[in-house]
Regions:
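Short amphipathic alpha-helical segment within the helicase RecA-like ATPase core
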Residues: 1-226
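A generic structural signal for tightly packed, nonpolar segments enriched in small/aliphatic residues
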Residues: 28, 38-39, 75, 160-424
Length: 424
């Protein structure tokens, strides 16, 4: 109906574009009409078919946002009607921020104002709420991306800790505590500390608490792996592509992005963010294959490969999460290359000890377009972690994503937990 209304007021320009074959209206098709009227310099049309998937609907919104941003216009209007769901309105504002992001800060867009024009009775007040939520998520996403893109000589564990502190300084709803190496050693976090032994950069455990609930409800704990640069340690990675190992802290960056978004939207929940931050380097002080270390939980671990280090920092952070008596714990980590072989680059691998939590994450993934696929935590895989010299080994042969999840599950017996392998 909104398209018909616009077409009528523009003397049938949309009908003419379709009749001339310039615009098909098919899913994710697009057309830009220049000088559609005296006051409209650009009319951007994006095709949306009935029954489009969530992924396609996100793509078409991002396509519209991209066309707006590259049109060199200062003011734009986005027409919405009762065919738009609330989450799609959130995606509009999120997409503008996402697409306009530039690490160098040299975005060429001249857009200064985007108004949503509501037709056919869509609630303006609800639209404003959705827009604000989308902007908060968009800024959180861009913070995550920016931290990931920052070179490892700048984005060190200390740098991440300072970012977390500055976020809490700006928002009274967030409390940040930084555990230094001496404090972690006193707590028995020798697994976490073993990864950063050889680095000149001190390891940190960043603890962020968002208390938005008016009641004493149990918090949700998010644990994000942050290896700010991963050489593999003594089990050295090949040189090709090693520059991308600065992205091995994106689990931790995701947690920071979530906390940033929470500080803006003021949700009525409690969330704890735990970010173990280390740098994995080789030197005379490095942990060696064959070494046995003791985790905070008391479980001993034989290190068979120092490049399987993410699980070594996560296991102590997962043990530390116990003190918050969490309702759920979700860890987010670029943990295994094996997940790319299993699922490619379109899906997050998930393992969980709770079908309740797994179903929540699958549902959220389907509704947001950021899908997950559950992998099994069967005892046959867990048995591959047997060690002759410790309680378990840090690698377990085939099915590396699953055995990594089995490793982490040993430290999550006291709560409902899920692991998200975001390496893909």
């Amino acid at each position: 109906k909104s398209v018909q209304h616009i077409d009528k007021n523009l003397d049938g320009v949309i009908t003419k574009m379709i009749q001339d074959g310039d615009f098909s209206g098919k899913n994710i098709s697009t057309c830009v009409v220049r000088n559609a009227s005296k006051n409209i310099k650009r009319l951007i049309l994006v095709g949306k078919e009935e029954g489009s998937s969530v992924q396609d609907r996100i793509k078409l919104i991002e396509l519209g946002a991209s066309n707006i941003l590259k049109s060199y216009i200062t003011n734009a209007h986005w027409v919405i009607d009762d065919n738009y769901e609330d989450w799609e309105i959130e995606i509009i504002s999120r997409s503008i921020l996402k697409i306009n992001y530039s690490f160098k800060g040299n975005s060429k867009s001249s857009l200064s104002k985007l108004d949503l024009v509501c037709l056919n009775g869509h609630s303006l007040s609800n639209t404003e709420t959705c827009t604000q939520y989308g902007e908060a998520v968009g800024r959180g996403m861009n913070l995550c991306r920016h931290l990931g893109n920052t070179p490892a000589n700048i984005c060190t564990p200390t740098f991440l800790a300072e970012k977390a502190k500055s976020l809490s300084d700006e928002n009274t709803c967030i409390k940040t505590t930084i555990l230094e190496e001496s404090e972690m050693r006193d707590l028995g976090m020798l697994s976490l500390l073993s990864v950063g032994n050889a680095s000149a950069q001190p390891s940190k455990l960043i603890v962020m608490e968002y208390n938005g609930s008016k009641t004493m409800q149990q918090p949700i704990a998010l644990v994000g792996k942050a290896v700010t640069f991963d050489t593999g340690g003594i089990s050295l990675k090949p040189g090709r592509g090693m520059d991308e190992m600065k992205f091995d802290m994106c689990g931790g960056a995701s947690v920071l992005g979530v906390m940033s978004a929470l500080s803006e939207v003021a949700l009525d929940i409690n969330v704890v963010g735990l970010i173990p931050a280390v740098e994995n380097m080789p030197s005379g002080n490095a942990t060696k294959p064959g070494d046995v270390i003791k985790s905070m939980s008391g479980i001993t671990i034989e290190i068979l490969n120092t490049d399987a280090e993410g699980r070594l920092i996560l296991c102590d952070a997962l043990t530390y999460a116990n003190r918050f008596k969490p309702k759920y714990v979700v860890d987010i980590a670029t943990l295994t290359g094996a997940v790319i072989g299993a699922l490619g680059k379109f899906t997050t691998g998930m393992l969980s000890n709770s079908e309740e939590l797994a179903e929540i994450l699958v549902s959220c993934g389907n509704s947001s377009g950021d899908r997950v696929w559950q992998l099994p935590l069967w005892k046959e895989y867990d048995q591959q972690l047997k060690s002759n010299f410790a309680d378990l080994a840090n690698i377990g042969g085939e099915a590396g994503t699953i055995t990594a999840g089995c490793f982490l599950s040993r430290f999550t017996k006291d709560y409902k937990w899920a692991h998200l392998d975001i390496a893909g």
